[in-house]
């Protein structure tokens, strides 16, 4: 009798888990459809207002940002979701707050690492991406706020997913998709090529703010950057995340190498054309897998 009850409990948990996954996939499938439409409109306006040169610059800045982010995120967004889910189901509110403090503290240190890496790599990236010139270091360094915003958003999103706030995450994705369109196009229109970095900083900053707005209401924001206990508690997640960091860095390095190769024998217009074709053939189709990954 006891064995039958245990089997029924296991089956019930599996059924609930499958239902949760299906609900997650369905909701995010709808969100990805919205993001697809908004992305098409945004890319069309960007190509019209900035031309192929501006679109190429967008590709270069995005690849640099992605590379630095993957180098420094320590795999935290991937590894912390499961632990947050376990604490949400079986732990106490204080344990959840303590874990969120650990995640956010490590995110702060990854942001510091990203700032240092951006400064160190800025001369090299300027040389390879801007016709062997060294005077674009400041532009690369100015991408640092984007990286920090990405790291913050990823950390908060991992907590929300762990707490199974499916609708909150879907709402965030929808808001970010629309606000990205509304916040970038004015910069492109009024400032042209000079407004690209400002537009990217504004859009990623809004994304980080929206993620924080939803997550802080559930778990108050608290960090302890100099607490050895907090750092030790987060270290296992960093250690497990090392393979993800290596694979993500390798993939983003390959993505960054393509514009470098194009620029070695072409110009920024060619990079823009490549990026547009890549978005049509790969980027939009990949949104389906993003919905499944969620």
Predicted features along the sequence, with ranges:
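Interhelical loop/hinge segments that connect adjacent transmembrane helices in multipass membrane
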Residues: 2-21, 200, 211-255
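Membrane-water interface segments that mark the loop-to-transmembrane alpha-helix transition
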Residues: 19-35, 61, 73-123
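Helix-loop junctions and terminal segments of transmembrane helices
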Residues: 74-90, 162, 220, 277, ...
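Alpha-helical transmembrane segments of multi-pass membrane proteins
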Residues: 116, 120, 131-156, 170-171, ...
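Alpha-helical transmembrane segments of multi-pass membrane transport and lipid-handling proteins
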Residues: 2-6, 101-131, 182, 189, ...
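Hydrophobic alpha-helical transmembrane segments
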Residues: 137-141, 170-219, 240, 278
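Alpha-helical transmembrane segments of polytopic membrane transporters and translocases
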Residues: 44, 56-73, 102-106, 205, ...
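Alpha-helical transmembrane segments of multi-pass membrane transporters/permeases
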Residues: 22-34, 140-146, 159-185, 197
């Amino acid at each position: 009798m006891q064995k039958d009850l245990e089997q029924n409990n296991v089956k019930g948990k599996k059924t609930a888990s499958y239902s949760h996954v299906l609900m997650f996939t369905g909701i995010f499938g709808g969100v990805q459809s919205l993001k697809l439409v908004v992305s098409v409109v945004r890319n069309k306006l960007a190509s019209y207002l900035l031309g192929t040169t501006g679109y190429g610059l967008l590709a270069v800045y995005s690849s640099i940002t992605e590379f630095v982010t993957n180098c420094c995120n320590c795999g935290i967004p991937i590894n912390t979701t499961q632990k947050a889910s376990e604490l949400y189901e079986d732990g106490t509110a204080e344990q959840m707050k303590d874990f969120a403090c650990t995640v956010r503290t490590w995110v702060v240190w990854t942001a510091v690492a990203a700032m240092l890496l951006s400064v160190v790599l800025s001369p090299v990236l300027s040389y390879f991406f801007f016709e062997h010139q060294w005077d674009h270091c400041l532009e690369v360094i100015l991408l640092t706020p984007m990286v920090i915003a990405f790291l913050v958003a990823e950390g908060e999103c991992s907590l929300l997913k762990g707490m199974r706030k499916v609708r909150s995450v879907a709402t965030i994705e929808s808001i970010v998709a629309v606000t990205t369109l509304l916040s970038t196009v004015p910069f492109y229109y009024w400032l042209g090529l000079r407004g690209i970095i400002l537009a990217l900083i504004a859009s990623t900053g809004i994304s980080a703010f929206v993620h924080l707005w939803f997550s802080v209401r559930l778990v108050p924001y608290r960090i302890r950057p100099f607490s050895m206990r907090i750092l030790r508690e987060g270290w296992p997640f960093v250690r497990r995340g090392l393979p993800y960091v290596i694979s993500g860095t390798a993939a983003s390095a390959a993505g960054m190498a393509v514009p470098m190769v194009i620029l070695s024998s072409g110009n920024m217009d060619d990079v823009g054309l490549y990026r547009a074709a890549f978005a049509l053939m790969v980027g939009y189709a990949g949104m389906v897998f993003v919905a499944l990954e969620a």
